[in-house]
Amino acid sequence: MKLLIAFIVGLVAAPTLVALAGVTGRLPSDAMSEPPKWESSVGMRALEASLEGRAKGLENPIAANDAAAFAAGQKLYADNCAGCHGSRSGPSKWGASGFYPRVPQFWQKGTDVTAEQAYAAVHDGIRYSGMGAWRDLMKDDDIWKVANFVARIKPMQSASKSAR
């Protein structure tokens, strides 16, 4: 019984202490400091779960082997996304360190999102980040082209190793 009470108290106390630290200004809010591991872990898992849920039911209208759509997606990425997410020539000068949460640098780490998840992120944006919604700025077909391209980006290090 004591163990159960301790467990319940822990369930209530831990989030209460974190919330209290947050509202009293004891948690860092700047974009440059490295966040605590628990914060990154909770935030990334919540984002992954959200993207998985938002992608359910979406049907990608572009065939995976559509070379013209891939080339168009690559151009759209270079014109609209590389400034934050980096390119083959390197990470974004400011997107890699001046944002929190950090802006994913796809060319350095690759992606582990499906085209449907990338579409959901581009179309509707990501709350509490610098990723805005593009649905009013880009045609739906173009969002799918970018999403297909992003889902296929592999890290440059892996690509150079496999070329050896």
Where are these regions (language model features)?
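Extracytoplasmic/periplasmic copper-protein system
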Residues: 157-164
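Periplasmic c-type cytochrome electron-transfer domains
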Residues: 2-71, 115-117, 135-149
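Extracytoplasmic electron-transfer domains, predominantly the class I c-type cytochrome c fold
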Residues: 98-152
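Short, non-ligating residues that shape and space the ligands of small metal-coordination modules
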Residues: 90-91, 140
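Winged-helix/helix-turn-helix nucleic-acid-interaction surface
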Residues: 94
